[in-house]
Amino acid sequence: MIKSNIISPDWKVPYFIKAVQTNRKNGFSVDNKFKSFNLSNDVGDNERHVALNMRQIRSRAPDNFTFIKQNHGKEVIKLPNSKAPLLADACYTNNKNVVCTILTADCLPIIITDNKGSFVSAIHAGWKGLGMGIIENAINKINSPNP
């Protein structure tokens, strides 16, 4: 279902698991290549515009979400995590109070959980990461007794 610039899937998961994706509309970025709702400071957009776009997201989301620093690789990180920077292309958590967040442009966002909602994972799947096994790596980390 599409509501403004937020898209939510219609999937059968526990009520406390939420997934949303933004589109490129209704934002503050004025350069046409960003299509107005850019959320990344890594692509040459005006930082003020990105901050205004981010404020829109934060006004509709819990305070406890973290962006990872993506690099088109295969690294997976468990949240919450105090290391900085959080360099990975996937994150997961077993904590119901933590939000897994990724950014995508032309890459595939993958969100996975189980029918109990015992974990959630957000995977940034570009062609490089797919070739390096980012999905398999995320599933293996989630299933590992010592992540």
Please give the residue ranges for each predicted region:
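Conserved nucleotide-ligand handling architecture
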Residues: 1-21, 25-26, 60
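Glycine- and Gly-Pro-enriched alpha-helical subdomains that act as flexible
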Residues: 111-147
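Short acidic/glycine-rich loop or secondary-structure boundary segments that cap or lie
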Residues: 30-31, 76-77, 129-132
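Intrinsically disordered, low-complexity, positively charged segments
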Residues: 16-55
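Short loop/turn motifs at secondary-structure junctions
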Residues: 16-18, 64, 147
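Phosphate-centric recognition/catalysis
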Residues: 47-125
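Generic secondary-structure signature for well-ordered alpha-helical cores
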Residues: 27, 59-62, 144-147
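One-carbon transfer enzymes
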Residues: 3, 9, 44-48, 55, ...
